[in-house]
């Protein structure tokens, strides 16, 4: 007889995020990505598809989305925005499937983290190319590159602070990453990559200042 699969439990599969004040009102991960991701999980739950396979699929779709943003045609930019939304949904579904089936592993969590960071770098870099293609403004595009460098520094500081705290979590919350990705999707659909450039410049700088302030106020010798 075929092995009976327990029904999919959505509440058990959803990861509890870190509720920053802004996420109470702009939690696109909770209200958009997770419900759509749950549909994906329900479809693949009875199959042999693994969480890691969904992680790879999310990454590949994200890479294609970034490539679309680099093309100087409006239709491809819109397609890139739609593909990025799909990548976000799949990125929500992989962890949900792992928790639902009890297949969570250190390798899977690390794989997801590594591919997320690579995907973020490609996505943010492609938006700079998209802005330059749309406007020809090299000055703000160069400023966007500075913002991208600041983003990488922001991520490095995040992991250093979390390592110092000996925190068990391995990456930024899904809600935070989803909000940043959603801003890219909205700006791409609206054709406002200029706003996105300013966000890429100002947000990492503000986050770096916050991380340094936060680290300064941590206990000198955490348990």
Task: Label the model's feature ranges.
Residues 51-107:
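Membrane-embedded alpha-helical segments that form the functional core of polytopic membrane enzymes
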Residues 81, 106-110, 167-171:
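The feature identifies polytopic integral membrane transport proteins across all domains of life
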Residues 48, 68-72, 190, 217:
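Helix-loop junctions at the membrane-solvent interface of multi-pass transporters
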Residues 22-24, 44, 48-54:
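Active-site flanking loop/helix segments enriched in acidic
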Residues 2-41, 113-223:
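A feature for the membrane-embedded catalytic helix bundles of lipid/isoprenoid biosynthetic enzymes
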Residues 60, 82, 86, 111-115, ...:
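Hydrophobic residues within alpha-helical transmembrane segments
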Residues 43, 84-87, 105, 109, ...:
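A generic hydrophobic-helix recognition signal that picks specific residues
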Residues 38-46, 95, 99-102, 109, ...:
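Short amphipathic alpha-helical coupling elements at transmembrane boundaries
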């Amino acid at each position: 007889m075929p092995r009976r699969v327990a029904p999919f439990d959505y509440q058990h599969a959803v990861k509890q995020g870190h509720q920053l004040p802004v996420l109470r009102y702009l939690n696109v991960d909770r209200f958009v990505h997770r419900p759509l991701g749950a549909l994906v999980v329900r479809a693949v739950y009875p199959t042999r598809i693994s969480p890691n396979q969904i992680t790879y699929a999310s990454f590949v779709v994200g890479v294609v989305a970034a490539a679309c943003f680099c093309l100087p045609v409006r239709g491809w930019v819109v397609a890139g925005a739609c593909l990025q939304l799909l990548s976000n949904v799949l990125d929500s579904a992989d962890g949900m499937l792992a928790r639902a089936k009890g297949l969570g592993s250190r390798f899977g969590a690390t794989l997801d983290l590594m591919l997320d960071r690579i995907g973020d770098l490609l996505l943010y870099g492609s938006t700079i190319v998209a802005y330059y293609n749309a406007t020809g403004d090299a000055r703000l595009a160069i400023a966007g590159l500075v913002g991208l460098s600041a983003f990488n520094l922001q991520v490095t500081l995040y992991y250093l602070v979390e390592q110092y705290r000996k925190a068990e979590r391995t990456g930024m919350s899904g809600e935070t990453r989803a909000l940043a990705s959603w801003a890219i999707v909205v700006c791409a659909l609206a054709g406002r990559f200029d706003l996105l450039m300013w966000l890429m410049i100002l947000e990492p700088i503000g986050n770096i200042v916050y991380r340094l302030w936060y680290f300064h106020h941590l206990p000198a010798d955490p348990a």
